[in-house]
Amino acid sequence: MKKILTFLAIALVLCVGFKSLSAQDTNRWDARLGVGFFGLQDFIPILTIGLGEDIDRATNVDFRFLPLITPSFEMSYECNKYISVGGQLTLGYATAKYEYIDDGARGRSSMIYPTLMANLKVNYLKSGSFSMYGLFGLGASTFILIDNSPYYSKEMNFTAIPMFNFYPLCFSTNKDNGFYMEVGYGSKGWLNLGWEMKL
């Protein structure tokens, strides 16, 4: 948490420092809805559920990995035409249904994991409605594991793991509303596509 607050403080200082570089400050909020593909946090369900002890003892495993496509919601504040700071929420879910080899008893493991990030967006090229930028962020994912086993009572476990965003190659085609694409890696996947709206 201390690192995240430090990151936000640095981002705000950069906003103030770069403000004099922009003659046309927008000072507006942006809202973004996006879809990512296989985010950094999606490895945890594979290791925890897919390679878990219950799965090793089971047969007829039905493993559903919804977070191959991860939805995200973002809000950011344009300090000027170069710098924006904001926050991001992504949601992931994975589940596995299985039968035990010994007696055919059925169990289920599920994991829900929201991710919160603090982001810094840096525009490095603008031409009309087209822009290129980099997006960098720090945050954490909270993993909620729910085990339903026929051999013991229902269990719920919580774990938080640090996350990052590193998207150096990003494109936007809007002035007020439009499409964006981000390439890199982090909590939003290796590719993130979405729609941006000026508020």
Which residues make up each language-model segment?
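Residues on the lipid-exposed face of transmembrane beta-strands in outer-membrane beta-barrel proteins
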Residues: 33-35, 69-77, 91, 116-122, ...
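Bacterial Sec-dependent N-terminal signal peptides
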Residues: 1-27
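Flexible, solvent-exposed loop segments that connect beta-strands
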Residues: 41-63, 88-113, 140-164
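Residues that define the transmembrane beta-barrel architecture of outer-membrane proteins
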Residues: 27-29, 65-71, 108-116, 130, ...
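Membrane-spanning beta-strand positions in outer-membrane beta-barrel proteins
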Residues: 30, 84, 129-133, 178, ...
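Eukaryotic alpha-helical scaffold "rod" segments
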Residues: 25, 115-154
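Outer-membrane beta-barrel channels and translocator barrels
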Residues: 26, 78-82, 123-129, 174-176, ...
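Short glycine/proline- and aromatic-enriched beta-strand/turn motifs that initiate or cap beta-hairpins
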Residues: 22-77, 196-198
